[in-house]
UniProtKB/Swiss-Prot annotation:
UreD, UreF and UreG form a complex that acts as a GTP-hydrolysis-dependent molecular chaperone, activating the urease apoprotein by helping to assemble the nickel containing metallocenter of UreC. The UreE protein probably delivers the nickel. HAMAP family: UreD (MF_01384). Required for maturation of urease via the functional incorporation of the urease nickel metallocenter. Keywords: Chaperone, Cytoplasm, Nickel insertion. This is Urease accessory protein UreD. The lineage of its organism: Bacteria, Pseudomonadati, Pseudomonadota, Gammaproteobacteria, Enterobacterales. Its main location: cytoplasm. PANTHER family: UREASE ACCESSORY PROTEIN D. Belongs to the UreD family. Coiled coil: none annotated. It is found in: Cytoplasm. The keyword Repressor does not apply.
Length: 278
């Protein structure tokens, strides 16, 4: 770790994980795995016929407090593919005045396939968090990614919100910016920005088309008792947004959408990660 990083995070813990994947002998393999602090690869499974690895990322402390930072840097070399997930939710606890930070960057060379499908992120009352996620997607590459954001603790009542959450998402395509967006939530605007709901979920997929958009919209409208959700197509980026108060229900919705679109985006039948079944 550099002196600059050490100085920047002297008030908290740094967890850093850098992964490279490459195609070797017909199998996508982890060719580089470098970690700093309590953040590492828990397990690599080869459950699929084409030898796509399912990789579980583990942060043993189970949560972040003010001053902590997690950095995930993933590179896929040409023609490789991987599914990345986590065994548990990312938890952001009450702040000591400092921000908890997560930084994700995914670099996809040509003709790769990435699925970044972690468990939810939970922002507890009085937490302060910054999350920055960037996808750099070269020509011919495919991505499905989702995340579910839970603001506050439903069991503690309606007034328990995070102090501040600042989330950046950047999707950079080979020939265009793709998508850039920012969500800022705090104690004062949480109810207004989320329409009274406590959970916001986002899924995006590249490349997509009108046929896939139609399937997702049909799926959303066919679900009984579903509260708020929608899907749109921004050039070749499918964007799905869901709101609700039941985290298990929304998680099932995300998994159902992923299961439906995977054959069209990734090009093969969906196979659930084992950890989703526990």
């Amino acid at each position: 770790m550099s002196d600059e990083l050490s100085q920047n995070f002297i008030d908290g813990w740094l967890g850093e994980l850098r992964l490279n994947f490459a195609l070797r002998g017909g199998r996508s393999v982890l060719t580089r795995c470098k970690h700093v602090g309590p953040f590492y690869v828990k397990k690599v499974f080869y459950s699929e016929n084409d030898n796509t690895p399912h990789v579980y990322l583990l942060h043993p402390p189970g949560g972040l407090v003010g001053g902590d930072k997690l950095v995930l840097d993933v590179k896929l070399e040409s023609d490789s593919r991987v599914l990345l997930t986590t065994p548990g939710a990312a938890k952001f606890y009450r702040s000591n005045g400092l921000y908890s930070e997560q930084k994700h960057i995914f670099r996809l060379e040509r003709n790769t396939a990435l699925e970044w499908v972690p468990q939810s992120s939970i922002f507890f009352p009085k937490s302060k968090a910054k999350i920055d996620t960037t996808f750099i997607i070269e020509q011919g590459s495919r991505v499905i990614s989702f995340d579910m954001l839970c603001f506050g603790n439903l069991s503690l009542g309606s007034s328990t919100y995070p102090e501040e959450v600042d989330i950046h998402l950047n999707i950079c395509l080979s020939d265009s910016i793709g998508l850039q967006e920012r969500l800022r939530i705090n104690e004062l605007n949480c109810v207004m920005k989320l329409g009274g709901f406590r959970i916001s979920a986002l899924l995006f997929a590249v490349p997509s088309d009108e046929k896939t958009l139609y399937k997702v919209r049909k799926l959303i409208t066919s679900v009984k008792h579903f509260q708020v959700g929608g899907a749109t197509l921004l050039d070749e980026i499918l964007v799905v947004r869901l709101l609700g108060n039941d985290n298990q229900y929304l998680k099932k919705m995300l998994h159902h959408i992923w299961y439906t679109i995977r054959p069209f985006i990734i090009g093969k039948k969906a196979m659930l990660p084992r950890i989703w079944l526990t």
